């Protein structure tokens, strides 16, 4: 993956200025690119202090042969939604973690992505951009290089990156759409559980009721921040815990995990700056749940 810029003004006096202003490359990555001779001026590797002139061509090779040495390569079936030189977007099933852990050392999604990269001849670090809980399904994005990862995380921080979820929750809403703005913190004496707390970090969830019966609602949730368990905590706090969420509500005979699915993402592609949008269907367990309880099929 390559960045290219043709100098068209006299404002810039050196390559460093161009790379920071035009591409917003971090100092850390810039240092790494220079050491690896991945920055070229008119096809010649240079230092960023080199001066520039009108019509000079600056190119930056963003790809490195590097691996996540602590991640084991494991063959698995990946549901690939989209792939290009900088991105891999998957539809993650429930019941699989994104990152390896002591309990999931070889069967996380990252293990499968590493195997996939190796199978197509790529040596890359595994760089998940967004997070999904073990029992949350849906769209998950992996960056193929540090530049794309940094750019997308920055978009999340600037609220340019859109993430939408479908949740099935208990009860019905008096207000069919709204914004939940309640800070979230780690619950005292718990490693996993979160709670609404005035001492927590800002957490904002936008919601819209799509379908409902007397006892259940299908809700679209848009994250304006990205706190751990944010939708689950917010919905539980306002009296509408997710169906099947044993941590913030109660388990259910209708579904064996929390009924939460990331069905839509939209962001600006870091190199072309085109807006990319992706969606995926509900998994079978949630589709059946909605048919049974809401007497309607969401699609």
Regions found by a protein language model. Give the residues of each.
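Short small-residue beta-strand/loop micro-motif enriched in glycine and branched aliphatics
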Residues: 96-99, 192-193, 217
